């Protein structure tokens, strides 16, 4: 069974793009990520994150990175649609990776609503949406 983990980085347009990244692998291989030392990137130094990146890419079956330019972020903020923009790009990653189940880090105050939106935008893919998913699921941390 293929599972996918998706997280964002850089929600502030002032500092650059918003990046949505996902990885997919067989569920039985999750221990490989744990043994590499993969965990929430906020708990790792930049050097360790950089070293882990190469190892993660070699370990997972597939990955996809989407970058949202600052002007798109600014336009969404003005319309109060930043969460919607993020859901659209997460759905794009979900569709590209096409796993059986995708775990996402919810930016919405209502994770279930966020997961349903991503599922609808990705043609019914199974989504598990949680707050702090990057701390709870190693596949999201990757």
Model-based region annotation:
Residues 1-4, 8-17, 23-142:
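Acidic (Asp/Glu) carboxylate-rich active-site/surface patches
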